[in-house]
Amino acid sequence: MAPKQSSHLTLAWAFLPLILFLFPLLIESRSTPPSHLPKEGKHHHQPFEFIKKLEGCHKGETVKGLHQLKQYFEKFGYLPRHLTNTTTNDDDSFDDLLESTVKSYQLNYHLNVTGELDAATVKQMTRPRCGVPDVVNGRTRSGKDGRHLNSAQLHVVSHYEFFPGEPRWRKSHLTYGFLSGVQSIDIQSLRSICASAFARWQRVSIFTFEEIGDVNSADLKIGFFRGNHGDGAHNSFDGFQGTLAHAFSPPGGHFHFDADENWGINPSSNDAVDLESVAVHEIGHLLGLDHSFDTSAVMYAYFGYGLRKVNLAADDIAGIQDLYN
């Protein structure tokens, strides 16, 4: 028996280095969170999730949570602020005004205009999106479809929009810099991504862009922020998978990312938002473009995780060239 026991010990000692090598890897794999989960420190709630519980609601009902729906429509411009009861949070009635508001939203996003919170409307409303309102100061769509296109393009329908009063820059060379907010991505990657995003607009417009070190002197100021960051309560960021970013029309120049999002660089899965895609969209706002209701356009308000949308569509190009003639 002695020789057999010795052979077993010899075999065990032979595999010991392999066991010692694999053990730390096994421990690490058990302690590492799945890649699709929000990064540490991120908010795990989804700000628009409450809308799913309201699916099927229609005029004449009183349902808990409808006051939040009214706040959603207020935030994105469909309901004037003086008409919503946002202080007491007790207005849960689906009245005529809310029905009209839902219809306006459905019309803008090419949904069936039912006035009810049907499945398609709820699905659209719960997607992550830009924080810039679709409607400003009660302004509805201008109805300018096809009006600005030349004779060779009359078969094309335009969906681009401008901000009220059509604000625009009075110069063609714009400088930009980076604010010292929350660091969500390393500065060199951010600089490279933003340079690429600006270049996409430069190729189709009158503009040239230059990064400068003194952000206070820059025309355009870019940074990452959380929650209420000084832009007013209605422009507060809301955490993971809500509003992704916002930017101000000329000559405002401020462009802010929500630091609580999972930002990625050309992500290959649905665990991150592509930083450059959102940057291209927000730069359009900086230059004076409002949201487009063309789903292929960069200036379309809604976005999603794992998507990459950086190439300007015909509608984006027509919009910026129309605004600056």
Language model segments and positions:
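Zinc-dependent metalloendopeptidases
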Residues: 2-325
